[in-house]
Structures are given as C-alpha cells and as structure tokens.
C-alpha cells in the first residue's frame, strides 16, 4: 500500500459562458468548502470561449466577445475561490487539466500569427488563482489515478469514447483514469486477477441547455464526482447531482 488515502473532488466540464449565469460555481465552492477534499481536480473546459469556435463560420476576432468570454471564466474561478477562502482555511491542492476549449486562444493565435502573444491561454485567468495547471492532453497521477481532459487512442489521436468509454479507458491505458470531455458519465471497475483498475468519465457541470448540442443535452450527466479514500488507483465513488447542489447551496 502507498500513502494514506485521500479525497478528491472532481469538477467536470463546466463551460462558463457569458450568456448564462455562473451561480453554479458558487455552489461548487460552497460544497468544496464543506467537503474539505485533499485535492480538487478541474478536468478542463471551465472556459467555453465561444467567440473562438472553430466549428462554425470562419473566425474573426471580436474584441468585446473575446473579453466577455475571458471575464466569465475569471468570474467562475473567483466564485469558487471566494468560497474556499472563507474562514481563511488552508486550501486543498487545486489541479486544472486544460481542455480543448481552454486552449482555444492559443489555437487561434497559432492560426493567426499576427496575434501571437496578444491572444493566449492565460487570458482565461488560471494564473490568478492557485491552480496547478497541466497542458492539454497531459495527464497527472494523483494517488495512482490519472486525470486528463480526455485520453487518446490510435494513430489519429482520437478521444477514447463510445458506449463503453470507461471500460475502453481501462483496456487502452492499463491504469485507473478519470476523464471529462463527453459530458456523459460512465464508470467501470475491473477486478481481473492480478489487477484492480477503475475508469470514470465524469459528466458535466452545466446547468443550461447548450444550443449547439440539440437533443444531446438530454444525455448529459450534470453534477460533480467525489472520489473517497483514493489510494493506489482505487477509490469509493460518490456522485452529487447539480440539482442537489442547487437545492443545498443555491439559497
């Protein structure tokens, strides 16, 4: 056995967007304050950065929309850390594994070199808060569990997904792994002889209906994951729904 077990609170894809309110981040901060986890993992895509969407019409940088995207990301983080800092308690270790939306600024600057240095990932504000930031697709091992926005497979580097995504994570990576990205939840425990592994796709933390997603909105799991007694890649999983957090902390 390794070191003593720890508790990890996972913030799934939360997509702060200027057209929708950020109250859910205050609820998350209050819950985290009461829970007192050893580690908080933001699995990525806290920032939506809709102004830099590469999937719609050709992107033209509109300064006001870009600033609004950055500001709403900053506001989301401020709401979380305002609650965590109440009573001047020691903060948990705070980890952010950057997602594909979080890195849209740098992708846009790479495609438009004249803006190199003027438009950058740091604009979403993670440097203003005590995050331990990991680059997009770089995993971090915490108590034997890998955390990454999404894991890839094959020569094309496609996200591991599908109907049995958690099981595929275990088979492809041979390690307990937690990912986000798909906004759905899937969970698998493999207790095969000689190994014990756990795979988790952790859903979303979005309380609005995303216009681009259509009927897929109804498939999204909305809440947070609590990994209790994490040690050597194993843990006890708890799921706290977003409606429950709103009922308890939204007053």
Stretches found by the model and what they are:
Residues 72-178, 182-193:
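Conserved catalytic scaffold of divalent metal-dependent phosphoesterases
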Residues 40, 94-96, 199:
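Hydrophobic/aromatic residues located in beta-strands of well-ordered beta-sheets
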Residues 1-78:
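N-terminal active-site segment of His-dependent metallophosphoesterases
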Residues 148-240, 244:
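Conserved beta-sheet core of the metallophosphoesterase superfamily
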Residues 5, 36-38, 91-93, 173-174, ...:
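A general structural motif
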Residues 26-28, 57-60, 112-115, 193-197:
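Glycine-rich, phosphate-binding/catalytic loops in enzymes
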Residues 249-250:
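Intrinsically disordered, low-complexity segments enriched in small/polar residues
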Residues 12-16, 44-47, 100-102, 150-152, ...:
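Active-site metal-binding loops of divalent metal-dependent hydrolases
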């Amino acid at each position: 056995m390794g070191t003593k077990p720890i508790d990890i609170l996972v913030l799934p894809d939360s997509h702060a967007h200027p057209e929708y309110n950020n109250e859910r981040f205050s609820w998350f901060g209050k819950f985290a304050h009461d829970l007192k986890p050893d580690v908080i993992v933001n699995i990525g895509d806290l920032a939506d950065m809709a102004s830099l969407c590469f999937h719609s019409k050709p992107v033209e940088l509109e300064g006001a929309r870009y600033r609004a995207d950055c500001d709403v990301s900053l506001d989301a983080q401020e709401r979380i850390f305002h609650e965590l800092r109440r009573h001047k308690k020691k903060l948990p270790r705070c980890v952010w594994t950057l997602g594909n939306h979080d890195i849209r600024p740098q992708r846009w600057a790479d495609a438009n070199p004249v803006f190199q240095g003027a438009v950058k990932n740091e604009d979403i504000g993670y440097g203003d808060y005590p995050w331990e930031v990991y680059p997009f697709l770089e995993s971090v091992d915490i108590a034997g569990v890998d955390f990454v926005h999404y894991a890839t497979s094959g020569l094309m580097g496609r996200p591991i997904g599908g109907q049995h995504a958690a099981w595929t994570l275990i088979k492809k990576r041979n390690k307990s792994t937690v990912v986000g990205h798909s906004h759905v939840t899937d969970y698998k425990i493999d207790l095969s002889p000689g190994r014990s592994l756990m795979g988790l796709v952790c859903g979303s933390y979005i309380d609005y209906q995303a216009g681009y997603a259509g009927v897929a909105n109804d498939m999204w799991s909305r809440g947070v994951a609590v990994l209790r007694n994490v040690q050597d890649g194993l843990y006890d999983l708890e799921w706290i729904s977003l409606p429950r957090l709103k009922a308890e902390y939204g007053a």
